[in-house]
Amino acid sequence: MKDSVIIVSGGMDSITLLYDKKDEIALGISFNYGSNHNEREIPFAKMHCERLGIKHITIDLGFMHQYFKSSLLEGADAIPVGHYADDNMKSTVVPFRNGIMLSIAIGIAESNNLKKVLIANHGGDHTIYPDCRPEFIKAIDEAAEAGTFVDVRVVAPYTNITKGEIAAIGKKLGIDYAETWSCYKGGEKHCGKCGTCVERKEALAEAGIEDTTEYEE
């Protein structure tokens, strides 16, 4: 039964969840909030939704670029290099980004009489992103249920697994991860050095997947 909305960025995790739950998904939603890499990743989200016959929409959140503070919104040169778990990667946090996106998706779900909102946060996000942590997901799920007539639920099945484990799921599903985008710098190729590029490399290696991503280095 197609009773779900998915927040789909075009990255490895959300594309895996898209294929993993494709039989349940009625609508894919991407958000353009003015980050360096939105223009690189959203086309992949749209492409995969179209491939699966799932309606896709992109919602503009340009106000976040104007009013929010994050290196992710300041241009490629502002993105730190290093491992995803390093403290310097905290500069890439867009404050309450998932909370805002989930709130909109919950409203869209209720407006379309859909019961669930899917999001692909994972265990590796917990160190850096407060709105990816289990306690946040639990709280917003309870708020969604309490705040909607149709008892919309937030479902985040990857919350306590690693990106490598997500890649292993994708491997079983036959996903070509070359058709996803990770790099926060948003250049013509993945930079190969920022936290998301490093994490991408590690996840693919952990899952035993040949990495055909084009990296600058």
Language model: regions and residue ranges:
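ATP-dependent adenylation/nucleotidyltransferase module used to activate substrates
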Residues: 1-174
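Residue-level recognition of conserved structural "scaffold" positions that shape functional pockets
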Residues: 17-18, 199, 215
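Local cysteine-cluster metal-coordination motifs and their immediate loop/turn environment
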Residues: 103, 179-202
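Glycine-rich nucleotide phosphate-binding loop and flanking beta-alpha elements
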Residues: 125, 204-205
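Short amphipathic alpha-helical interaction/hinge segments
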Residues: 148, 205-208
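Short cysteine/histidine-rich metal-coordination sites, predominantly Zn2+-binding motifs
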Residues: 186-187, 207-217
